[in-house]
Swiss-Prot record:
Gene: rplP
Keywords for the protein's UniProt record, in alphabetical order: Ribonucleoprotein, Ribosomal protein, RNA-binding, rRNA-binding, tRNA-binding
Subunit structure of this chain's protein: Part of the 50S ribosomal subunit.
Biased composition (Basic residues): 1-18
Signal peptide, first to last residue: none
GO biological process: translation
Origin superkingdom: Bacteria
Record-stated family: Belongs to the universal ribosomal protein uL16 family.
Entry function: Binds 23S rRNA and is also seen to make contacts with the A and possibly P site tRNAs.
Record flagged with keyword RNA-binding: yes
Protein name per its UniProtKB record: Large ribosomal subunit protein uL16
Residue numbers spanned by region Disordered: 1-21
PROSITE patterns (UniProt xref): RIBOSOMAL_L16_2
Amino acid sequence: MALMPKRVKHRKSQRGRIKGNATRGNTVVFGDYGIQSLDAGWIKATTIEAGRIAAQQYVRGQGKLYIRIFPDKSVTSTPLETRMGKGKGEPDFWAAVVKPGTILYELSGVTEQQAKVCFARLASKMPVKVRFVERRSA
């Protein structure tokens, strides 16, 4: 089931601009390995779910997958062949706003080689460029 907020204050949001790099959510916290976004963009809830399924099919209960992004922005669209005007369209899908440096997924309980293969499968589903990162031991 695709992720979406339980309830929101406003159903329709403005598109906005994605400026700068991520200052929060840019370090591996829960797992041992992660994938980090190198581009800015929107990631649909269905895309997040497709990535989750691809990763979990590969690890098969060995490791634990953590999803670090949540689709909290509603993206609206008007029906095809509709004339201009008549207000803003209805919410079409939910998306997560991702900045460069944001950690998208984390993985624990697997070897580094397994994590790299798993994230390579997952990266093919993502609309942004990503890279493999490890947890830094302080």
